């Protein structure tokens, strides 16, 4: 994608720079009469969360569906994530660069990498990469809001070692799966009560060991597709004593019924299943099995603490003060990799919960790596950029967007640290269920935001 952006600039005779982390900034000179205006940075990211339902993970195998509802045009995902986050914003930015009829100050169209993972693109930008100190971010997902703050975030990845042993005699193999969880964005949707498939699966297997006294061994365990996504699917291969088959199958059935009841409103299609599997010559030793399941079970997921102020309680997107998500478990030859994504509007609480989770990991002998840490961001809502953005909404769309703080980290946290004096306004179309296979984007609001952006450029 970075290659494409550089070629895009070259074909149009626009200067550009590329960072070591493949972030790209494309510069466009001010329109006549705008030469003395302060430069404006237009910010987006080029990476997208790619998740797919089982059987639909081949690129290009499905086509998004367009439809109309109550007079509003929509595009929705079709068994895969849509990529409206941040494809819509990036499309607008490229359209601006491609249209010489627009009136605007000097522009720096900045497109970052790894925003959906560890934000390493923004975190490692050279301090002279951009000159502008006004940033219009087109990565918001709430049409009637302007984002002026974000939670801090800490992502850590633990590597839990294990040993393989020969499969015990008299054992049979099963594949246990949690499927059709709704998933979603672990910031936007963290207060929705949606199921975390990794957590459900680990809890089920730990109950089998500790409460049902089944001497269970793992063969494999994996789940999730991204740090920042609530995992809707997880799968494990296990072996159990032949005499425990009936008890184990009944336990899985009971778990399925309990999960269906608990998540009937949030994850109506979720299911927990087990099927006999092929024979395995080796399994993960007892210690490795127990450590992985206990770690996952002991780490909190979902909201940990709620905000107490009235304004936050009125806004579901920011009513959570502190949260955590286990978004990804992968298996290597000698270790499991488990990710933990902590968020908070309070830097003290962010650091405190992250330390507690790290201690859970390290007590098991795991190696822990911090892959992202960014503090909370709070914009000055009285800054001229914020006022201008709200005035343009009023002029073009006849309403003023509500300033909000979002419960997920934004690159703004890094920008305010790396570029002193910077101010950021974040807007965008209505996107529902980002990072999931039920992602929707309102094309009607995308058109409206495009009109806002063009008008804002002419007044910036």
Regions found by a protein language model. Give the residues of each.
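A non-catalytic alpha/beta surface segment that caps or lines the substrate-entry region
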Residues: 1-38
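Substrate-recognition/cap regions that form aromatic- and gly/pro-loop-enriched pockets
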Residues: 321-408
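Active-site-adjacent substrate-binding region
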Residues: 189, 196-221, 379-422
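Acidic, glycine-rich active-site loops and adjacent beta-strand->loop/helix elements
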Residues: 46-48, 110-118, 139-143, 182, ...
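His/Asp/Glu-rich mid-to-C-terminal helical/loop segments that flank catalytic regions of hydrolases
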Residues: 6, 194-211, 242-245, 291-302, ...
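Midchain, well-structured core segments that form catalytic/ion-binding scaffolds
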Residues: 72-76, 115-117, 123-343
């Amino acid at each position: 994608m970075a290659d494409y952006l550089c070629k895009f600039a070259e074909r149009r005779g626009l200067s550009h720079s590329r960072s070591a982390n493949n972030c790209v900034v494309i510069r466009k000179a001010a329109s006549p009469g705008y030469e003395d205006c302060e430069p404006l940075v237009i910010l987006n990211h080029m990476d997208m969360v790619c998740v797919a339902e089982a059987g639909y993970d081949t690129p290009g195998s499905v086509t998004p569906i367009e439809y109309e509802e109550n007079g509003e045009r929509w595009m929705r995902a079709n068994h895969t994530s849509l990529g409206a986050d941040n494809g819509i914003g990036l499309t607008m930015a490229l359209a601006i660069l491609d249209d010489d009829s627009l009136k605007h100050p000097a522009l720096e169209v900045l497109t970052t990498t790894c925003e959906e993972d560890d934000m390493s693109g923004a975190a490692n930008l050279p301090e002279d990469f951009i000159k502008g100190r006004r940033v219009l971010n087109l990565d918001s997902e709430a049409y009637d809001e302007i984002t002026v703050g974000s939670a801090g975030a800490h992502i850590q990845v633990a590597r839990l070692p294990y040993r393989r042993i020969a499969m015990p005699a008299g054992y049979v193999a099963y594949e246990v799966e949690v499927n059709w969880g709704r998933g979603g964005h672990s910031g936007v949707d963290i207060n929705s009560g949606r199921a975390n498939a990794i957590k459900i699966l680990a809890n089920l297997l730990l109950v089998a060991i500790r409460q049902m006294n089944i001497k269970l061994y793992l063969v494999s365990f994996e789940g999730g597709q991204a740090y920042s996504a609530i995992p809707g699917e997880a799968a494990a291969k296990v072996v159990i004593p032949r005499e425990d088959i009936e008890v184990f199958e009944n336990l899985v059935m009971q778990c399925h019924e309990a999960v269906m009841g608990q998540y009937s409103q949030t994850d109506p299609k979720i299911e927990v299943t087990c099927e006999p599997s092929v024979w395995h010559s080796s399994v993960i030793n007892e210690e490795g099995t127990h450590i992985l399941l206990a770690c996952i079970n002991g780490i909190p997921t979902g909201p940990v603490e709620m905000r107490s102020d009235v304004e936050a309680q009125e806004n579901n997107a920011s009513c959570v003060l502190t949260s955590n998500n286990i978004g990804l478990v992968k298996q290597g030859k000698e270790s499991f990799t488990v990710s933990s994504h902590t968020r908070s509007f309070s830097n003290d609480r962010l650091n405190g919960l992250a330390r507690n989770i790290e201690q859970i990991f390290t007590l098991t002998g795991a190696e822990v790596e911090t892959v992202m840490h960014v503090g909370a961001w709070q914009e000055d809502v009285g800054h001229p950029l914020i006022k201008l953005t709200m005035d343009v909404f009023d002029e073009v769309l006849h309403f003023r967007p509500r300033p909000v703080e979002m419960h997920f980290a934004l690159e703004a946290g890094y920008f305010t640290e790396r570029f002193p004096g910077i101010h950021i306004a974040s807007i965008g179309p209505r996107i529902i269920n980002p990072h999931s296979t039920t992602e929707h984007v309102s094309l009607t609001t995308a058109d409206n935001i495009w009109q806002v952006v063009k008008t804002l450029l002419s007044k910036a």
